[in-house]
């Protein structure tokens, strides 16, 4: 049995999306048990619509719901100990839950997670890792917005953690890892990127295969299993990809409705277009993982629908089932030991 705590008030639609999404996840994974946190007047009526889910879940009342526009410092002051977001995270800390899922305010969720759960040993900064659809299937990209800027050591930690996540989700024994850069040549890029690349070259690991620098157009190609960057660049890349996907979908819709012949062609190609739409649907790959914390926290997109929230829950489920935290902690310890040994010999 896997226990997942849910911030039922998170996201643009709160319980109206969160609870149906959890119900979908429960249908697919009957061994999940949920603990919902939220305002009783809003959560209980929605939960009552799903009797099977309600029977297999627990509801705990909260006093405060964190707003999507609240500043992290404001959210910490107002919500510590009594908000649905804080209580869902705290359930992981106390062992009541194995993972937490929230569609709430990203900054507040990260601040509360760091304050409540603390960081893994030897990890200086957390990263948000996202699943990215590619021509080869899916890749992991991190950091997509946890922090602005990262030094060489932090980028290397992201590489090790991202590779651990890839092994857990994709069942790849030795994921390929690339550092996002302005070119693939070794002389290009910022000093911290070049230094991180040198560290990864000098410290071979069983758990990942370093493939060098990759460019922005390599992300969608699926050139590597894990793309590593700092949060400022990663978030811009994410938002650009989301905007491009929406633009392409709209341009395609316009082209297919422009003439009678185009409309007829659309009818015959409907199956192919439906498969393309499903491939590009952000709800299918929803769920950013906060890596580097001493507990599992999953961030769902605030505007996700029920299917999207279900996807985020499933990411958390897979993380727990595959013992992600233990594996990442072991990988980091092994890497830091190996790197210190290589450095001392140098």
Swiss-Prot record:
Q: Which UniProt keywords apply?
A: Cytoplasm, Lipid biosynthesis, Lipid metabolism, Phospholipid biosynthesis, Phospholipid metabolism, Transferase
Cell compartments where the protein resides: Cytoplasm
Report the EC number(s), separated by commas if there are several. Answer: 2.3.1.274
Listed GO MF terms: phosphate:acyl-[acyl carrier protein] acyltransferase activity
For the keyword Zinc, the answer is no
Enumerate the InterPro entries for this protein.
FA_synthesis, Phospholipid_synth_PlsX-like
As its record notes, the protein acts as a catalyst of:
a fatty acyl-[ACP] + phosphate = an acyl phosphate + holo-[ACP]
What GO terms describe the biological role, i.e. biological process, of this protein? fatty acid biosynthetic process; phospholipid biosynthetic process
Look up keyword Cytoplasm and say if it applies.
yes
Q: Which PANTHER family match?
A: FATTY ACID/PHOSPHOLIPID SYNTHESIS PROTEIN PLSX, PHOSPHATE ACYLTRANSFERASE
Recorded family membership = Belongs to the PlsX family.
Share what the entry says about its subunit structure, partners included: Homodimer. Probably interacts with PlsY.
The job of this chain, per UniProt, is described as: Catalyzes the reversible formation of acyl-phosphate (acyl-PO(4)) from acyl-[acyl-carrier-protein] (acyl-ACP). This enzyme utilizes acyl-ACP as fatty acyl donor, but not acyl-CoA.
> Could you tell me what this protein is called?
Phosphate acyltransferase
Instruction: Tell me what organism the protein belongs to.
Output: Brucella ovis (strain ATCC 25840 / 63/290 / NCTC 10512)
Which lineage is the organism of this entry classified under, starting from the top rank? Answer: Bacteria, Pseudomonadati, Pseudomonadota, Alphaproteobacteria, Hyphomicrobiales
Q: Which gene encodes it?
A: plsX
